[in-house]
A protein has these predicted regions:
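Ribonuclease/tRNase effector modules and their secretory precursors
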Residues: 1-101
């Protein structure tokens, strides 16, 4: 299944989680989780996928960067990863969420 569709399904089902960094960025930019959900639902493509190594587990992971606008027209930058448990997309963890420059 397409990764963007999997991310959109997590957003639609309100299965989004934020790191402290992402939460702080939202607060600084005066955004909330609804803005992020709207932005993810409006996305037409994943801008970039980055291969990374988790510092805690030392396992490879993929971070997806998406830039899209919310329903108010604000362009939002998000970076996150799909977390899968037992073959099921559990939720989308947002590592970074802020207004795009």
């Amino acid at each position: 299944m397409d990764t963007l569709i999997r991310i959109k399904r997590c957003a639609l089902a309100n299965r989004l989680r934020l790191t402290n960094k992402a939460r702080d960025e939202l607060e600084i930019d005066d955004l909330d989780i609804t803005d992020i959900r709207e932005s993810l639902m409006n996305a037409v493509a994943i801008y970039k996928t980055i291969r990374s190594t988790n510092p805690q587990s030392h396992r490879r992971e993929y971070l997806h960067i998406i830039q899209s606008h919310n329903f108010s027209g604000i362009t939002i930058y998000t970076k996150g990863k799909l977390l899968v448990e037992e073959g099921i997309d559990t939720f989308y963890l947002l590592v970074s969420s802020k207004r795009a420059l």
